[in-house]
Amino acid sequence: MGLKEDRWITDMALPHNMIEPFCENQVGKNVVSYGLSSYGYDIRVSNEFKIFTNINATVVDPKNFDEANVVDFIGDICIVPPNSFALARTVEYFRIPRDVLAICLGKSTYARCGIIVNVTPFEPEFEGHITIEISNTTPLPAKIYANEGIAQVLFLQGDADCEVSYKDKKGKYQKQEGITLPRILK
């Protein structure tokens, strides 16, 4: 299983629509950088956010998630409260090939400010926007800039196609659009 380089990412993104929209260059002046890098792709966070709140004093339960736990926000700058959490989504829509697994890591620009980004792996044949988990670990409010970089995706190509892909098993987040809250298959 090898890490894929910029030429491969471009070859998969443009003719095969693996990443839409696709930025062929790294954009980094006066913004948190995004676009193609040497061995990855820096994804952007959209302007849609769900910010966790304790106003309704409910319990966060992944098996029975209460939407009262979050407040919807749309804007160019999202302020994540101290020691709090927000969900967002990528600007980019992904179509992962059957022989590829993608792993996402937070950007150092945000990490150095105490903002931790978590995204689970993009499984083979996953398709959709990526829901991004953003944690503000600081005792201060933190700014997240919409339409700028938030994390980097690394693409790992297997030696052969997997037996069962995310699409084959009808993954619960397949073809998700917007920010998708926790789901449990029943």
Curated annotation (Swiss-Prot):
Protein's UniProt name: dCTP deaminase
Any one of the GO BP annotations: nucleobase-containing small molecule interconversion
SUPFAM superfamilies: dUTPase-like (SSF51283)
Protein purpose: Catalyzes the deamination of dCTP to dUTP.
Source domain of life: Bacteria
Catalytic reaction list: dCTP + H2O + H(+) = dUTP + NH4(+)
Record has rRNA-binding as a keyword: no
Keyword field contains Transmembrane: no
Subunit structure: Homotrimer.
UniProt-annotated catalytic positions: 133 (proton donor/acceptor)
